[in-house]
């Protein structure tokens, strides 16, 4: 069986048995510092076999940080694969064994310097279902206070303050195209209009959060 169960994976419905593809065997075709590329032989619903190539990803989180006046914290950073500076909400990948909320708190503090008192899990998205196991948990954060940030070596990030209306205008103009940020905006708009329910919690402060 596969050893790379994706974040957010759920059991298939029995009604979908006629669509299911079953694992036969796996081969690692590339392993870099970050990417793990697999080629799996799979059995199709009709009994024939074929291959699926995909990237194994540890999973990630994204934070929608809300100031008390309703404005939002965003980042601008250069994304080499698309060769442009992207406007995004803070995000980062999970460390091995790290709970998603711990990761969200860590990434927000490291990248922006902000800490949040209250957190709410908005949901999860799978952003590249044809070729990656990556799942991104989206968290809302409020009750922000600004401290110092601690960027990783080789990380260059500008932090800015904006509004949801401005982000929606940027998306409509085609200057904001990051999928996780677009989904976070959509869920935030729905939450503000009482169409997206979340549960707020007050976890221990970052330095008090137990490490796995």
Which residue ranges define each predicted feature?
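Unchanged
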Residues: 50, 59-62, 93-179, 198-212
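Short helix-capping/linker segments at secondary-structure and domain boundaries
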Residues: 188-201
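Short loop segments at secondary-structure junctions
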Residues: 46, 67-69, 78, 142-146, ...
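Acidic, metal-coordinating catalytic segment for phosphate/diphosphate chemistry
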Residues: 25-62, 68
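Conserved Nudix-box catalytic region and its N-terminal flanking loop in Nudix hydrolases
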Residues: 2-7, 13, 17-20, 52, ...
């Amino acid at each position: 069986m596969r050893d790379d169960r994706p974040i957010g994976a759920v059991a298939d419905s029995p009604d979908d048995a006629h669509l299911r593809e079953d694992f036969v065997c796996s081969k690692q075709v590339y392993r870099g510092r970050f990417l793990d590329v697999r080629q799996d032989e799979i059995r199709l619903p009709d009994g024939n076999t074929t291959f699926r190539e995909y990237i194994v990803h540890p999973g990630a989180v994204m934070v929608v940080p809300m100031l008390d006046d309703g404005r939002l914290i965003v980042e601008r950073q250069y994304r080499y694969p698309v060769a442009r500076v992207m406007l995004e909400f803070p995000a980062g990948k999970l460390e091995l064994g790290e709970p998603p909320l711990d990761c969200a708190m860590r990434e927000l503090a490291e990248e922006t310097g902000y800490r949040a008192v209250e957190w709410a899990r908005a949901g999860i998205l799978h952003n590249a279902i044809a070729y990656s196991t990556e799942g991104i948990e989206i968290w809302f954060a409020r009750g922000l206070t600004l401290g110092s940030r601690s960027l990783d070596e080789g990380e260059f990030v500008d932090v800015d303050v904006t509004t949801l209306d401005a982000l929606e205008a940027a998306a409509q103009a085609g200057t904001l195209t990051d999928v996780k940020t677009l989904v976070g905006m959509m869920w935030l708009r729905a939450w503000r209009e009482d169409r997206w329910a979340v549960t707020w919690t007050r976890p221990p402060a970052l330095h008090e959060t137990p490490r796995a």
